[in-house]
């Protein structure tokens, strides 16, 4: 039997490599005559660690270098945390597969002296670390008395900063903590009523060349239908709002019978304005549900909030 070969482009961070190795193992397990290799590299978002993500102002912070490898023929696919993948992709590339989603929730991680608290009971002035404007806006809206501070670096670096006493607690994606073996550090899964998660959070997205039918067939073995439907609705919502991965837009999606329900939120960075609504529709047309919800939020002023945020970062 002829050996098939596939090369994956991946970020070099520990979490990215854990995720990419999982994809490699699953593909080789499902396709016995497939040989998968990995080309890892640092992206712009990995290199710039002294500036808040939103201030860098690039929608492809963690993806551009991987996409370049595919476009010049040095890689067949790229594995991304789907939440980092922009909704508009370069010409010639497409989102070929969405894997089964891990828990998409945000999680509270605390240092030892704060183990007696939940997020809702943290004392006024507690220092909360997050690099996400989405988390920041929602938490400021709910808990204006807390002190929020930007935190950069990979998951392990952030936990080290927390344990050294620089922060009282930090907010991270539950999925990343679980994949890295830090599930025991999850002190609280943050309820949707407090913080809606990022678009695509918890799922992996496999990007490939649009016309590469052989590769599309190979990666299709990892496609999870329900996860894909939810994430496509979420990505359609984000695309319609013309938001990027770093703006204060949150979502939560669920499927019951043949209906998909999508909740969405847009907030100002200071947490003073927050618009939330939901939309539902046939699970066969998830992108229509996302578009419908975006239109509902636009009618309530979401456009104005996002324009003010983009203007704010253009001025800096």
UniProtKB/Swiss-Prot annotation:
Assigned GO CC terms: cytoplasm
MF annotations from Gene Ontology: hydroxymethylbilane synthase activity
EC number: 2.5.1.61
PROSITE patterns xref list: PORPHOBILINOGEN_DEAM
Catalytic activities: 4 porphobilinogen + H2O = hydroxymethylbilane + 4 NH4(+)
Signal peptide: none
Pathway per the UniProt entry: Porphyrin-containing compound metabolism; protoporphyrin-IX biosynthesis; coproporphyrinogen-III from 5-aminolevulinate: step 2/4; Porphyrin-containing compound metabolism; chlorophyll biosynthesis
This protein's UniProt keywords: Chlorophyll biosynthesis, Porphyrin biosynthesis, Transferase
Cofactor: dipyrromethane
Domain of life: Bacteria
Cofactor details (free text): Binds 1 dipyrromethane group covalently.
Location of S-(dipyrrolylmethanemethyl)cysteine modifications: 245
One BP annotation, GO: chlorophyll biosynthetic process
CDD domains for the chain: PBP2_HuPBGD_like
Subunit structure, as described in the record: Monomer.
Function: Tetrapolymerization of the monopyrrole PBG into the hydroxymethylbilane pre-uroporphyrinogen in several discrete steps.
Record PANTHER family: PORPHOBILINOGEN DEAMINASE
Misc. remarks from the entry: The porphobilinogen subunits are added to the dipyrromethane group.
Listed HAMAP family: Porphobil_deam (MF_00260)
Family: Belongs to the HMBS family.
Protein name: Porphobilinogen deaminase
């Amino acid at each position: 039997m002829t050996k098939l070969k596939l090369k994956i482009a991946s970020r070099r961070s520990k979490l990215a490599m854990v995720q990419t190795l999982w994809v490699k193992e699953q593909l080789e397990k499902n396709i016995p005559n497939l040989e998968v290799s990995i080309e890892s590299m640092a992206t712009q978002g990995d290199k710039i660690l002294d500036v808040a993500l939103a201030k860098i102002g690039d929608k492809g912070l963690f993806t551009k270098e991987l996409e370049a490898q595919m476009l010049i023929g040095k890689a067949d696919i790229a594995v991304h945390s789907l939440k980092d993948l922009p909704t508009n992709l370069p010409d010639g590339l497409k989102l070929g597969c969405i894997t089964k989603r891990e828990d998409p929730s945000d999680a509270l991680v605390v240092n030892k002296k704060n183990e007696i608290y939940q997020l809702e009971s943290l004392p006024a002035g507690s220092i909360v670390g997050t690099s996400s404007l989405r988390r920041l806006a929602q938490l400021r809206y709910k808990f204006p008395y807390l002190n929020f501070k930007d935190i950069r670096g990979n998951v392990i670096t952030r936990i080290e900063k927390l344990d050294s006493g620089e922060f009282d607690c930090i907010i991270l994606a539950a999925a990343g903590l679980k994949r890295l073996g830090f599930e025991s550090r999850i002190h609280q899964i943050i309820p949707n009523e407090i913080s809606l998660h990022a678009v695509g959070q918890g799922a992996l997205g496999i990007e490939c060349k649009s016309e590469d039918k052989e590769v599309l067939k190979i990666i299709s073995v990892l496609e999870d239908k329900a996860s894909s439907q939810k994430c496509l609705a979420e990505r359609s919502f984000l695309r319609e709002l013309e938001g990027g991965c770093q703006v204060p837009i949150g979502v939560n999606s669920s499927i019951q019978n043949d209906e998909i329900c999508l909740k969405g939120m847009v907030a100002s960075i200071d947490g003073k304005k927050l618009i939330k609504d939901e939309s539902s529709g046939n699970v066969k047309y998830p992108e229509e549900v996302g578009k419908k919800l975006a239109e509902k939020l636009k009618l309530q002023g979401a456009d104005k909030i996002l324009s003010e945020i983009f203007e704010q970062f253009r001025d800096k």
